[in-house]
Amino acid sequence: MTEFQIKEDGRSMIPSVFSHAGKKELVLLQYPQLQALDMVKHCFTTRMGGVSKNEFSSLDLSFNRGDDIEAVKENFRRVAEAMEVPAGQIVCSDQTHTTNVRKVTAEDAGSGLTKERPYHDVDGLITDVPGLMLATFYADCVPLYFVDTKHRAIGLSHSGWRGTVNRMGRATLKAMAEAYGTVPEDVWCAIGPSICQDCYEVSEDVALEFEQEFSGHGSEI
């Protein structure tokens, strides 16, 4: 899971390991460049530091894979504690491989965690509300982080192969531009951990879609 939050007071990157020690030790990944902005809190969770058992061990953050619901809630509480944010301020995506982006407001706090989501089919979240924590979820897909330092707004998007070929990054920036006046020159971007090209095989049909959409970059596909 990836989480992202604007601090209350507040382009090539390699994540570093952040450990939240104590009885609830977590191993999280963070980007030093985003931390240095002193505007956002963020992390990419690993499987370590939770309470889930067996095939869900241990930091399972999914409510729909058959894990014990209370264990998942405790895992969320541990991440929230490490990020120093109430769990009720987390806002979760509803990922279905779209390029839909939701403007998150204070009324959305807790959506997908402490209350039902008032939205569906949302793979990108944006906000300029301090204190809200955006959360998206990953297996082998790509997390995209956006920080508009001028307008103090953030975006967090899930981009699988379908989202990538449909330009999820562009859709997120467009949504931020419409909502906050964001322009690319003011935005720091980061690409989170995902599967590598050596481990991800696609069908000929999928490869053809990429060739057609990114015809000017054929040698890189």
Task: Show the residue positions of the predicted features.
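Active-site microenvironment for binding and transforming phosphate-containing groups
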Residues: M1-I221
